[in-house]
């Protein structure tokens, strides 16, 4: 039999070794993190959901670093946490949950760059009683987070409608507008709670704005659980695989969706909403808007932007083989379009961005486009602005003067506006967030 004292001694030695190893590892991580901070210096925080760390409260435990699925977004330097790779943060929110001292707050927008979002309470209800918002429309772009919001919003609806009793004849418990990740998850949750529900979408099939992504685009998500379907273990997947998943979900759960239907108006009658659609009216006690930010594409406001060769999305780069392409924008959508076009034979690509550096793109995208420029595959025109678009040519201006760029095709990829007409119709108020937590003020 091994003496008890020997066992205790061995355990003590192992603990001491572990502590020394952990301390050394922390020093190495801190050194690497300092380099990371230098590398990403000047990169603006994203306007989407991201963490702000209170240095007076942070104890440097690095729980946030370990919890973040993106790995490089957060670091600990000199005993304090930092959002180092701001562009790499995609709003998981796991850091806030993991922090043992509540030093992290999740906010939208920054002091430099505000973001317009509908105001919602903790149950995702807007100031307009009975109208809820979930997913990208409310600033939650990550697929897993959007699905969770959809489910939680329906939980609140189910609780409220249960207290009210049965709905009047001909009136649904819930109308869901949008069949993207949030809308799909909300539909499943409504079915699970036994609510009478109708889900409609103006598009022709499931997936919402995901279907407009370029072919083969990598979509970032996290493991999620869908009501009536079960756990889905995904972190990086393609656009096509994600759409396939949603089709499988609908088939196996029996969820039904009405496609190609537009909302044209809404009014309140006898305590419920009567929503006018292109397929006729629908009456519902509650409405969940899960449309994503599918308002009008932002445009440049220059002569020629309405010409036929100007596009506001890139769905398939293979359609543009051999073309001279101008991409306008400095976010991930623009850079990913450049990367996709650069793989096609004969394409000649120019990327115009109004700022002097890429402030809002993921590190892998920034590195890739910079490498394409170094290889001569892409012409980068930073700190430039489009002045005029004509057939086959585009005129730009930068610090050196005016330039004429060949452009058989112009892709204006500078984001989309909120669907303000839809929101106004439902009486939803929009607020500009500048580094503030979501919720009413």
Q: What are these regions, as identified by a protein language model?
A:
Residues 1-66, 71, 75-77, 97, ...:
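Non-ligating segments of multi-cofactor redox enzymes
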Residues 44-45, 217-224, 236-277, 281-284, ...:
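A Rossmann-like FAD-binding core segment of flavoenzymes
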Residues 72, 103-117, 290-315, 400-440:
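Glycine-rich beta-alpha-beta "Rossmann" dinucleotide-binding loop(s) and their flanking helix/strand
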Residues 38-60, 74-91, 111-122, 137, ...:
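Ferredoxin-like iron-sulfur electron-transfer modules
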Residues 202-240:
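Active-site-adjacent segment of FAD-dependent monooxygenases/related oxidoreductases
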Residues 100-161, 267-270, 278-307:
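Glycine/serine-rich phosphate-binding loop and adjoining beta1-alpha1 elements at the start
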Residues 60, 91, 133, 257-259, ...:
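A structural signal for the hydrophobic beta-strands that form the central parallel beta-sheet
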Residues 123-198, 313-358, 401-403, 415-425, ...:
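Rossmann-like dinucleotide/flavin-binding elements
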